[in-house]
Amino acid sequence: MRLTALLPLSLALLASPTLQAEELPKAIQQLQAKGAVIKGSFDAPNGLRGYAAEYQNNGLALYLTPDGKHVLVGSLFDEQGKDLSAEPLKKLVYAPMSKEIWAKMEKTAWIADGKDDAPRKVYLFSDPNCPYCNMFWEQARPWVESGKVQLRHIMVGIIREDSPGKSAALLAAKDPAKALHEHEKAGKASKLKALEQVPEAVQQKLAANMALMEEMGLQATPAIFYQDDQGNLQSQQGAPRPELLGKILGKR
């Protein structure tokens, strides 16, 4: 799994333990000082010692030479062409990252679209004025209405001046799921109005959603997150092409 498939993510997003500086060789500490976050170490061939790091929002393999004074940075391949860095980075960097992101999204103020017992959950950062969010809502109807998928809309407001107020109106509705359904079903004819006075509790929910979006480095909607058949976190920016719907939503 590549981090680029997950969209840019802030280093601050992750709270997994890192190796303490005093446990690391000086050469590795020098890279720490340049911003590399060491997530763990792993065995490597020919006397090398591998370290899995996170740097500038990407997983990075570091290889300490046997003398402990030099570091090789990048992928290491064997004579069969196998990338020996891939599995350690997946285990030590990307897997914990996926769990952390999913857990953070679970705690947001999302609006459910579909049955609670649907076997597949899909999160999307959604703006009420976003035509591509509405397009994805339409695309997902067969999966949602059959009970196979629940979409979880993390409401934000970034497209127009009244977007935050409209998201607040949905979050403050007596039945947010019903309000969202009516808004999306109506499309351009939606009569959703922005709240002029937003309750403090709703404002806090919306602010938290916006903060997470910013923390994850996301700049547009819809930003869609789902788990593939192996449980790996994947993402899609924008309304997906029809041939990608099966990957995101599962079997129809």
Q: Where do the PLM segments sit?
A:
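Bacterial N-terminal signal peptides that target proteins for export
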Residues: 1-7
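Hydrophobic helical h-region of N-terminal Sec-dependent signal peptides
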Residues: 8-13
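N-terminal signal peptide c-region/cleavage motif recognized by signal peptidases
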Residues: 15-18
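C-terminal cap of thioredoxin/glutaredoxin-like
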Residues: 22-50, 55-72, 190-252
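A short, surface-exposed interaction/processing loop segment used at functional sites
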Residues: 68-95
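C-terminal low-complexity, charged extensions that often adopt amphipathic alpha-helices
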Residues: 94-101, 144-145, 222
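A short beta-strand-turn-helix
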Residues: 102-120
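Structural alpha/beta surface segment adjacent to cysteine/selenocysteine redox centers
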Residues: 118-128, 134-198, 214, 218-219, ...
